[in-house]
Regions:
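N-terminal secretory signal peptides and thylakoid transit peptides that target proteins
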Residues: 2-18
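An N-terminal hydrophobic leader/cap segment in hydrolases
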Residues: 13-46
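Hydrophobic "lid"/C-terminal helical patch
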Residues: 14, 125, 306, 310
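Flexible "cap/lid" subdomain of the alpha/beta-hydrolase fold that forms the substrate-access gate
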Residues: 32-45, 54-56, 63-66, 94, ...
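Structural motif
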Residues: 50-51
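Conserved HGGG/HGGXW glycine-rich cap/lid loop of the alpha/beta-hydrolase fold
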Residues: 60-106
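Active-site helix-initiating loop/hinge in glycosyltransferases
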Residues: 72, 301-302
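Short, well-ordered alpha-helices that flank and scaffold nucleotide-derived cofactor binding pockets
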Residues: 82-85, 89, 154-155, 308, ...
Length: 316
């Protein structure tokens, strides 16, 4: 009897010690979380309420024709840090956090994922630009931001004067042409769409290396690696595999009206698996583009080259 009591006491105390250690690590991690980075030089930060009931965080700077920059996953507007200030020398640049990312709202997903549809996310950004007085503007979107940008050109054709899509082909094309090579290149497209919590658990792997993270990675993790951030990213992908496909199927006969420039990683999966220009020329009337150095996140990997391409296209 004494041995049994002693064993129970030991187990109880061990449990308390483990719980205390976990809580201590959680508190330490929270205390060690980096503060938000300041806006780019010459930019100001804004938090803009939208018609969709969320608040979108954005930075704005420069002067000239308006230009909206949209990031991918799991990044934030900070991904444009080496490009936006230089574009601001000739454009009024707005770099925004998408719904669910960075310092924008991270709402709980609805059962049909509609509040993370690209339609809802595009409307957020239309509201942001209108809040600054811009009814028409040029648009650059990379990765998930490119998918929001694609939907924006269809839902708001009069608002977008020119569009640049970076390292994507249309979502509908990808999901209707699934191959083993696609699954191997983009496993997260299938992992993150799994019901909670499986998808959210998979999202942990997208946060970058645990050891010696860069300042940019720390900034992306600050909000995107929280439980709410991981859920939001999964909802973005769940919407892409459900309600976004419904919207895209309804618009298969429509073409993007504005000029489109497509940039993709010359050494990446898009170049290896797809005829990127041919696919986009089925979806838009006026398409140019080329393979680029710098990888999938070329705005970080080759900012000078990306800047030159954006300037050439947007100035014309």
């Amino acid at each position: 009897m004494t041995d049994s009591i002693d064993r129970r006491a030991v187990l109880r105390n061990a449990s308390l010690l483990v719980t205390g250690a976990v809580l201590s690590r959680a508190v330490a991690a929270q205390q060690a979380a980096p503060a938000p980075l300041p806006p780019f030089p010459g930019f100001t930060a804004h938090d803009i309420p939208t018609s969709g009931g969320v608040t979108i965080h954005a930075v704005k700077g420069g002067s000239g024709p308006p230009l909206l920059l949209l990031h991918g996953a799991p990044q934030t507007h900070y991904t444009w840090r080496d490009v936006a200030p230089r574009l601001a020398e000739e454009f009024t640049v707005v770099a925004a956090d998408l719904r669910g990312y960075g310092d924008s709202s991270q709402p709980q997903g609805l059962p049909d994922h509609s509040n993370y549809s690209k339609r809802a996310m595009a409307q957020d950004q239309i509201d942001v630009m209108r809040s600054f007085g811009f009814e028409r503007f040029a648009l650059v979107g990379q990765d998930r931001g490119g998918r929001v940008a694609h939907r924006m050109t269809l839902d708001h054709p009069d608002a977008v004067t020119k569009a640049v899509f970076i390292d994507i082909v249309p979502t509908y094309y990808l999901y209707t042409h699934v191959t083993l090579a696609f699954i191997q290149a983009y496993p997260h497209w299938f992992n993150l769409v799994q019901p909670s919590p499986a998808g959210e658990n998979s999202a942990v792997a997208l946060q970058g290396p645990a050891n010696a993270p860069s300042p940019a990675q720390l900034e992306y993790r600050r909000r995107n690696s929280t439980p709410e951030g991981r859920h939001s990213m999964c909802e973005d992908y769940r919407a892409a595999a459900s309600i976004d496909l419904e919207h895209d199927a309804a618009d298969l006969d429509r073409r993007i009206r504005c000029p489109v420039n497509v940039l993709w990683a010359a050494d990446g999966a898009m170049d290896r698996l797809y005829d990127v220009l041919a696919i986009w020329r089925e979806r838009a009337r006026n398409v140019t583009g080329k393979g680029m150095p710098g990888g999938h996140n070329m705005q970080e990997g080759a900012p000078n080259e990306v800047l030159a391409e954006l300037q050439s296209f947007l100035r014309a």
